[in-house]
Amino acid sequence: MKYDLVGIDGNAFNIISYVMSAMKECGFSTSDRNDYFKEATSSDYSNLIVISDEMINRCNEIADDVLISKL
């Protein structure tokens, strides 16, 4: 697992920045990153955490696939 929200400062802006950086590293388009931002900020902090965790899981799946393909 390359990406993890555990250990990240719990400030909402830090979480969003971390997730968006992970998405960029994984090749997500600007449009995808903007969609994440809109969804993550559409409600309360709990929503932000749920949406961010789901996206980090997707990023980890992509990172794992890339790692496996290099073996």
Predicted regions and their residues:
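Long, contiguous binding/interaction regions
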Residues: M1-L71
